[in-house]
């Protein structure tokens, strides 16, 4: 009981009526959360200011309908409401551009995983590792049907095989598709990238804690679009090497 009270419980799955992001597990997602919170601060200030101005104008006009009849323009107020929003937009845009660049930058990956979207499952290739038969480690990942789910497994999220990766390792995901456009998205890792036929897109992740992270195809791709979950297990390096030796 004492251990449970002193443990940090992370939310890495979608929750009913959820109103916020899943907990972050990578620096990129942490930056996205921080940017969102900062922007919301300015948005609430703008909402309050605009609401107050609207209320004041409506109240004043209702008391004296001809109060502003002969006012054609106000140079000072026009300058203010032109410059002030421009400054706010710059304050919001500058850090967002920095974050966008950092999310797009792939920094010296220690390993590469290729994710291929197909109707309606994912195929993964660990191109840096070769098994005893001289073949690249690869496997397919299918959603577990609802009637085969075990206790603790999640409907439309759990898969028969998981992508296993080590923590604190720069990982590059190379994403493509074999038929139609899919989308490789894992919210807790800050990953969302298109999987397009004939095109290779890449995104990086530095997972900073162990856990199981779920994602889904985020591009409508046909009848069973909802049956393309993504399950990534982040484990310690020794556990990853042990899993790799079993492949």
UniProtKB/Swiss-Prot annotation:
Q: Which SUPFAM superfamilies match?
A: Cupredoxins, Cytochrome c oxidase subunit II-like, transmembrane region
* Listed Pfam families: COX2, COX2_TM
**UniProt-annotated binding residues for Mg(2+):** 219
As to how many cofactors bind and how, the note says: Binds a dinuclear copper A center per subunit.
Could you list which ranges are Mitochondrial intermembrane topological domains?
Answer: 12-38, 102-247
| Subunit organization | Component of the cytochrome c oxidase (complex IV, CIV), a multisubunit enzyme composed of a catalytic core of 3 subunits and several supernumerary subunits. The complex exists as a monomer or a dimer and forms supercomplexes (SCs) in the inner mitochondrial membrane with ubiquinol-cytochrome c oxidoreductase (cytochrome b-c1 complex, complex III, CIII).
Descriptive protein name: Cytochrome c oxidase subunit 2
Q: What organism does the record attribute this protein to?
A: Kluyveromyces lactis (strain ATCC 8585 / CBS 2359 / DSM 70799 / NBRC 1267 / NRRL Y-1140 / WM37)
Top-level taxonomy: Eukaryota, Fungi, Dikarya, Ascomycota, Saccharomycotina
């Amino acid at each position: 009981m004492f251990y449970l009270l002193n443990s940090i419980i992370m939310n890495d799955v979608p929750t009913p009526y959820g109103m916020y992001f899943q907990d972050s597990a990578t620096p990129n997602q942490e930056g996205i959360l921080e940017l969102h919170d900062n922007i919301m601060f300015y948005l609430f200030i703008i909402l309050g200011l605009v609401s107050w101005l609207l209320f004041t104008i409506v109240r004043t006009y209702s008391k004296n309908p001809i109060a502003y009849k002969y006012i054609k323009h106000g140079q000072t107020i026009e300058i203010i409401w032109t410059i002030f929003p421009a400054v706010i937009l710059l304050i919001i845009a500058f850090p967002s551009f920095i974050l966008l660049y950092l999310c797009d930058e792939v920094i010296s990956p220690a390993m590469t995983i290729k994710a291929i979207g197909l109707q309606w499952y994912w195929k993964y290739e660990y191109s840096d590792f070769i098994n005893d038969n001289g073949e690249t480690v690869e496997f397919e990942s299918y959603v577990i049907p609802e009637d085969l789910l075990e206790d603790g497994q999640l409907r439309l999220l759990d898969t028969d095989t998981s992508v296993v990766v080590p923590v604190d390792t720069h990982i590059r995901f190379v994403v493509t598709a074999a038929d139609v456009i899919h989308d490789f998205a894992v919210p807790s890792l800050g990953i969302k990238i298109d999987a397009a036929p004939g095109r290779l897109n890449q995104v990086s992740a530095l997972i900073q804690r162990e856990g199981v992270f779920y994602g889904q195809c985020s591009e409508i791709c046909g009848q069973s679009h909802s049956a393309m979950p993504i399950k990534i297990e982040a484990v310690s390096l020794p556990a990853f090497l042990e899993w790799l030796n079993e492949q």
